[in-house]
Swiss-Prot record:
Protein name per Swiss-Prot or TrEMBL: Cytoplasmic dynein intermediate light chain DYN3
Keywords assigned: Cytoplasm, Cytoskeleton, Dynein, Microtubule, Motor protein
GO cellular component: cytoplasm; dynein complex; microtubule
Taxonomy, superkingdom: Eukaryota
Organism of origin: Kluyveromyces lactis (strain ATCC 8585 / CBS 2359 / DSM 70799 / NBRC 1267 / NRRL Y-1140 / WM37)
Signal peptide as annotated in the record: none
Positions of disulphide bridges: none
Localization annotation: Cytoplasm, Cytoskeleton
Length: 370
């Protein structure tokens, strides 16, 4: 993952190249549930309340891939174009295999962000350490050349206080252990860690790479309580993590994540065993189609319209001569019924040549055919 200094230098270089304050960010969001994604979109909308479209009013899509674009204007005058790709995490599907194709289609000058959304209410926290490490290790394997800043953001983070107050297994000791474990892992993976209780919009803004002012950066950072934790990469240290609980064996865990993950699974209550067989998609994900194959067969559409118009004209000539219709045999009646059936199914076909020409012209203009 890119360091904070590398990300800053890259942003500065891009700004000098474009000679303006426009910033392009390509974000890949990983989350389990569309309700989680919808809540995160509310926070993104809050960065610039005047910007359109409102992501929160759209139907969020995760399977296999959802794609959204949003333009944001910050108070400092930055124009930020967010290209957001949403896919399920690796423990839910194999959509991550599409990542190289997704990143290849992003604007060349855009900075990259990988963001994992976790939900305190809708997910099993006992798997979080394993999931976080697994995702960011796999990202390096799938796309080793990509320099991207990584983040984890916990949504509904105030729910951890509810668990601490109402569940015997969620003691204050367990909460502190989880707090220190998450920050130790984030420090090891060189990623940022956010929550949404205190500064949801600022946390989302930082996670997706929208520039923060100096005052916003000071307001965002919080290292005291798990429900409020917001730690950007480069601002944390082992000494700061040790201040939460001095009994946390940092000297053991900092170089031994296997032991940390094992102890984490023992301390953090498991809600329900994960059935990997039922949640993982075993079918291979088809590669993204060639864009040329997505272009409509306009010539075929035009030929079909002319054929329908010919049938429509024949039908009008026949229906305007009732005496002739009465003399038509049963075979011709069946043929007439076929023509009428075609006409009924496409009543929007114009009745006159000028209207048809107008429709054809509209199709040609829409697809820019010369």
């Amino acid at each position: 993952m890119a360091t904070k200094l590398e990300a800053f230098i890259n942003d500065l270089r891009l700004q000098c190249e474009t000679n303006d304050t426009t910033k392009y960010v390509s974000i890949v969001l990983f989350c389990e549930k569309e309700t989680t994604l919808k809540l995160f979109f509310q926070y993104i909308d809050g960065i610039d309340t005047n910007s359109e479209p409102k992501l929160a009013v759209l139907s969020p899509t995760l399977s296999p891939v959802g794609y959204y674009t949003k333009e944001i204007t910050t108070e400092d005058g930055w124009q930020v174009i967010l290209n957001i790709t949403c896919i399920p995490p690796p423990w839910k599907s194999s959509s991550i295999d599409l990542l190289p194709s997704i990143l290849k289609s992003d604007p060349e000058k855009s900075s990259k962000r990988f963001v994992l959304l976790l939900d305190w209410i809708n997910e099993d926290q006992s798997y979080w350490l394993e999931d976080i490490e697994g995702l960011f290790v796999q990202l390096k394997q799938v796309s080793p050349e990509t320099k991207a800043a990584g983040s984890v953001m916990m949504l509904h983070s105030d729910y951890c206080k509810h668990l601490e107050n109402t569940h015997t297994k969620w003691s204050s000791t367990a909460i502190d252990f989880m707090h220190q474990s998450l920050r130790t892992l984030a420090l090891h993976l060189k990623i940022s860690l956010y929550s949404d209780l205190k500064n949801s919009v600022l946390a989302a803004k930082s996670a997706v790479g929208v520039p923060l002012s100096t005052e916003e950066q000071k307001s965002l950072i919080d290292m005291v309580n798990l429900e409020n934790v917001n730690v950007t990469y480069g601002s944390d240290s082992l000494n700061k993590i040790a201040m939460i609980d001095e009994n946390f064996p940092l000297s053991v865990y900092k170089d031994n994540l296997s032991t940390l993950k094992h102890d984490f699974s023992d301390v953090i209550p498991e809600i329900k065993p994960r059935n990997m067989g039922s949640c993982a998609i075993t079918e291979p994900i088809k590669p993204l189609p060639d864009l040329q194959s997505l272009i409509p067969d306009v010539q075929g559409q035009l030929s079909h319209l002319y054929e329908l118009q010919r049938k429509n004209s024949s039908l009008k000539r026949v229906t305007n001569q009732p005496a002739v219709v009465q003399d038509i045999g049963q075979d011709n009646t069946m043929a007439l019924n076929d023509i009428a059936s075609d006409n009924n199914h496409l009543q929007h076909v114009p009745d006159d040549d000028s209207a048809l020409d107008s429709l054809v012209h509209g199709i040609v203009q829409r697809h820019q055919i010369s």
